[in-house]
């Protein structure tokens, strides 16, 4: 426990060690063992980050969000559903830290769904369950209390070159997402690349996508 010192007067020491940990690969055993430190870090906002840590080329919000997203994507025990919510994900999504929420969504898109290795074989090898990701997206869209930037982070959930989701379903989800994001999207290449696919199966939702995105 001395590796990650806690206490209001030891933030600099804590963040020095914590930053180094987050910059490395996530291991299931450590994720479980260090649960209390993830919980502590989730409760800290950027206003508490030491100035020196803000200038180093590593985003602490992105770092913890990436670890949580990896755990959610790969570990069966880490769930976020109506009935079952892992304590850390419950804390992330019941709070108002939009930066961490946005980075969580964005990494699932960048690192999993739009990963260059994204195939059925790769998902199986990495223990990624597409239905789990779909259910999460639906659950987030059912909420009305999140900031538009969080919904805009779903842009990376549209893989521009590989068929991850059913096009009809994806067109519907993206139309709803753009309504929640006020027409903003943090990466539009995937969506724009798939407009012709959307139009063939769901022209009504495709028009909504265009309307929300353009106007």
Where are these regions (language model features)?
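Non-catalytic all-alpha helical scaffold/repeat segments
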Residues: 1-215
